[in-house]
């Protein structure tokens, strides 16, 4: 065991040679390096695989009951202060290491083909390797200073990855938005770290927890100050994990390449905030009110993320809001003190969401063979449909990932989400009702995404788009105005400004380009990689893009089994419970580790029924009528309800506009913060230029004229001296006369 632990130092730095060598090679041998650029994927995968092997070995040691803290080096500032750099390997670290390495390897393999035609291929792999380095360093940190250093590096990597295609203005704006939003959280994190150092005098987790618990027990610390410092630490996690109200950067982060989205949402950036709260949970549990704040932010984020996902047309943005909502479940579990359930859902959600994002990348890849490189079209679910005939493997993988996220047994997310919902009933019935309702919303919008993408016909190629008036069917959404809809070449898209009462599909139209393959700046040439044949229809991705999907399907099927309590009789296969021993659980303090299968099945039936209800509603509303005309009469009977629908239309229209406009939160920030700061900046600039500079320049000008006057008088001319003498005498004489 000691032989294994002495090599743990290589974990955070094993990948460091990759970005360094890529940079050096591009400087000294640019042409040769670019000619063999795909060779650089191999060392990235190889080194990360080595780290993965170490991670699994360490995890086995953790399951067997070991914990390790390895001291590395110490930097002594003076006799009273020294800073220690170290590695902390415990159950939380080993879980995060496995998540980062397994998902990271699959994303790198996937990216080799996905980015093969991009001019920034080498830069992409350098950024990805550096991002993995930062995250590995973060989860192995033994103190708050190391956490903050790698925390900032994770933020820098996210800035570089989100803005990878920086020549696109929307991508450049997205990375700036993510960076600025996270600056708010990072500032709070730094203040919180300094506050707890002022209280305890230590950055090390072991000493920090021990000293702080003693101070709380002896009532030797100011409660308000402690709550403030803990809240500031939590603000850092709120920003990094896209929790309300600092979630606004997450949907815009989808402007980066899809493999980046998979990595950020599954194993790196958004997981960093969850990791921070989990790492500091022994600190938070003894602070009044802070756990309530964490759970409150979690439940708000759950509901907000689910409602904002309802109207998304972009497939990646829909998955982004799904991530936001699912991270809310994890934050809720941490706030309730259900440590095991939180980490369980972190594991299952990571693999399911990686599967969905890589699946969406395969979908986008296939759509680009028709519409060219145009994210507004290749990622638009309204322009998809019927893809199950063209990408059957991707369809199956995406379908299983969708079922998992919906909480359908026996897939992974069912076990973890159900555990969180069951614990929420013990914590707060109101929170439990919201969590259960959101589970139904999750099933609704995820199946909406699936149906719009794979069912029906490929909308871009429908004959009805030729302009012929051949269709008089009603809108496929029941929430539009009464009347027939003729489908023309101008495709009906959702709009923000909807004054006519239309809902999910407005009659305001936006013409599609006649030649969608002409691109001003093509990043990717859409051809089949083997025979250079251009496709006029979607096609399945290559094998090295499908292989990670199949592996993630296996994870989605079986990773949930690590948390299923099989401890019946002589069986003791609850791996996660042994992995997390000792575990924090404020809701089951008197538990004897027994498991009531009857209670579990009863609660599961309720949650699964809600999920199936959401799936049914989604299927009823979004299953295309072009492929299921037998339901057309029923649909038209709802559409023709006449005046009874007016109030319902208004309600749905308000909900739709609220969801489509992201709850008006971005608009509020734009008005209340951005414009206010701009006005304050302009006033400050005016005050600086006119008042501060005016005083300084006024003194200079006055001195200049006084000096010029003195210089003129003292020019050596007798007449000037005589004039000054007589003028002075006259002044004194007048003053004397007045007095």
Curated annotation (Swiss-Prot):
Membrane topology label: Multi-pass membrane protein
Q: Does the keyword Plastid apply?
A: yes
Task: Spell out where the chain crosses the membrane.
Answer: 9-29, 40-60, 89-109, 125-145, 147-167, 185-205, 224-244, 258-278, 283-303, 327-347, 354-374, 396-416, 425-445, 546-566, 605-625, 718-738
GO terms under cellular component: chloroplast thylakoid membrane
What EC number(s) is this enzyme filed under? Answer: 7.1.1.-
* The keyword Lyase appears for this protein: no
Which EC class is the enzyme in? translocase
Give the GO molecular function terms: NADH dehydrogenase (ubiquinone) activity; quinone binding
Task: Output the InterPro entries linked to this UniProt entry.
Answer: NADH_UbQ_OxRdtase_chlpt_su5_C (IPR002128), NADHpl_OxRdtase_5_subgr (IPR018393), ND/Mrp_TM (IPR001750), NU5C-like (IPR003945), Proton_antipo_N (IPR001516)
Q: Where in the cell is it found?
A: Plastid, Chloroplast thylakoid membrane
UniProt keywords (A-Z) are: Chloroplast, Membrane, NAD, NADP, Plastid, Plastoquinone, Quinone, Thylakoid, Translocase, Transmembrane, Transmembrane helix, Transport
Which reactions are catalysed by this chain? Answer: a plastoquinone + NADH + (n+1) H(+)(in) = a plastoquinol + NAD(+) + n H(+)(out); a plastoquinone + NADPH + (n+1) H(+)(in) = a plastoquinol + NADP(+) + n H(+)(out)
Q: Which GO terms fall under biological process for this protein?
A: ATP synthesis coupled electron transport; electron transport coupled proton transport
Looking up NCBIfam families in the UniProt record yields: NDH_I_L, PRK06590.1
Functional description taken from the UniProt entry: NDH shuttles electrons from NAD(P)H:plastoquinone, via FMN and iron-sulfur (Fe-S) centers, to quinones in the photosynthetic chain and possibly in a chloroplast respiratory chain. The immediate electron acceptor for the enzyme in this species is believed to be plastoquinone. Couples the redox reaction to proton translocation, and thus conserves the redox energy in a proton gradient.
Complexes and interactors? NDH is composed of at least 16 different subunits, 5 of which are encoded in the nucleus.
Family indicated by similarity:
Belongs to the complex I subunit 5 family.
The name this protein carries in UniProt is NAD(P)H-quinone oxidoreductase subunit 5, chloroplastic
* Organism the protein comes from: Buxus microphylla
Q: What is the lineage of its organism?
A: Eukaryota, Viridiplantae, Streptophyta, Embryophyta, Tracheophyta
Name of the coding gene: ndhF
């Amino acid at each position: 065991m000691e032989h294994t632990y002495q090599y743990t130092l290589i974990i955070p730095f094993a990948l460091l040679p990759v970005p360094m060598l890529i940079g050096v090679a591009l400087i000294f041998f640019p042409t040769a390096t670019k000619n063999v650029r795909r060779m650089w994927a191999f060392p990235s995968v190889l080194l990360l695989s080595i780290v993965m092997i170490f991670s699994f070995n360490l995890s086995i040691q953790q399951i067997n009951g070991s914990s390790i803290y390895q001291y590395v080096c110490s930097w002594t500032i003076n006799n009273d202060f020294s800073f220690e750099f170290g590695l902390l390997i415990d159950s939380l670290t080993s879980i995060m290491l496995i998540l980062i390495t397994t998902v990271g390897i699959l994303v790198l393999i996937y990216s080799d083909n996905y980015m093969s035609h991009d001019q920034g291929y080498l830069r992409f792999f350098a950024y990805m390797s550096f991002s993995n380095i930062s995250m590995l360093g973060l989860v192995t940190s033994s103190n708050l200073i190391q956490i903050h250093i790698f925390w900032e590096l994770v933020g820098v990597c996210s800035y570089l990855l989100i803005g990878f295609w920086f020549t696109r203005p929307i991508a450049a704006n997205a990375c700036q938005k993510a960076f600025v939003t996270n600056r708010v959280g990072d500032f709070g994190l730094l203040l919180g770290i300094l506050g707890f150092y002022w209280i305890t005098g230590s950055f090390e987790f072991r000493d920090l927890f021990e000293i702080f618990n003693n101070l709380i027990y002896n009532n030797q610390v100011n409660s308000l100050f402690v709550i403030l410092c803990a809240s500031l630490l939590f603000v850092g996690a709120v920003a990094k994990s896209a929790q309300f109200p600092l979630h606004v950067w997450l949907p815009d982060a989808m402007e980066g390449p899809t493999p980046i989205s998979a990595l950020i949402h599954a194993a790196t950036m958004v997981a960093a905030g969850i990791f921070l709260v989990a790492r500091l949970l022994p600190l938070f549990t003894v602070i009044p009110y802070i756990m309530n704040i964490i759970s409150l932010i979690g439940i708000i984020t759950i509901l907000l993320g689910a409602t904002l996902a309802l109207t998304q047309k972009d497939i990646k943005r829909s998955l982004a809001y799904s991530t936001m909502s699912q991270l809310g479940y994890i934050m809720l579990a941490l706030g309730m003190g259900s440590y095991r359930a939180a980490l369980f859902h972190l594991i299952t959600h990571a693999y399911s969401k990686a599967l969905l994002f890589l699946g969406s990348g395969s979908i986008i890849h296939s759509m680009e063979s028709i519409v060219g490189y145009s994210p507004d079209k290749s990622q638009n679910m309204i322009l998809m449909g019927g893809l199950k005939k063209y990408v059957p493997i991707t369809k199956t993988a995406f379908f299983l990932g969708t079922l998992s996220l919906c909480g359908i047994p026996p897939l992974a997310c069912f076990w973890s989400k159900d555990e969180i919902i069951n614990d929420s009933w013990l914590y707060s019935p109101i929170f439990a009702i919201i969590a259960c309702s959101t589970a139904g919303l999750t099933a609704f919008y995820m199946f909406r995404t699936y149906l719009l993408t794979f069912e029906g016909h490929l909308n871009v190629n429908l004959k009805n788009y030729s302009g012929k008036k051949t269709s008089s069917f009603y809108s496929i959404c029941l929430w539009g105005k009464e009347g027939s809809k003729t489908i023309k070449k101008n495709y009906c898209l959702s709009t923000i400004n909807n004054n006519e009462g239309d809902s999910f599909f407005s009659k305001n139209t936006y013409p599609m380009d006649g030649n969608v393959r002409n691109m001003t700046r093509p990043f990717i040439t859409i051809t089949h990689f083997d025979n250079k044949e251009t496709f006029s229809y979607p096609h399945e991705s290559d094998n090295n893009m499908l292989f990670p999907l199949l592996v993630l399907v296996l994870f989605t099927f079986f990773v949930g089994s690590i948390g299923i309590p099989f401890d019946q009789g002589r069986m003791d296969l609850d791996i996660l419970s042994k992995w997390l021993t000792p575990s924090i659980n404020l809701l089951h303090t008197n538990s004897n580790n027994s498991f009531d299968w009857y209670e579990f099945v009863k609660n599961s039936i309720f949650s699964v029924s809600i999920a199936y209800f959401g799936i049914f509603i989604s299927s009823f509303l979004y299953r295309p009528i072009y492929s299921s005309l037998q339901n057309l009469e029923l649909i038209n009977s709802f559409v023709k309800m006449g005046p009874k629908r007016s109030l319902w239309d208004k309600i749905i229209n308000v909900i739709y506009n609220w969801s489509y406009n992201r709850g008006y939160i971005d608009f509020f920030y734009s008005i209340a913060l951005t414009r206010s700061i701009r006005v304050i900046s302009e006033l400050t600039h005016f005050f600086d230029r006119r008042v501060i500079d005016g005083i300084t320049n006024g003194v200079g000008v006055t001195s200049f004229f006084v000096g010029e006057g003195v210089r003129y008088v003292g020019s050596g001319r007798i007449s000037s001296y005589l004039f000054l003498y007589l003028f002075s005498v006259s002044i004194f004489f007048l003053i004397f006369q007045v007095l």
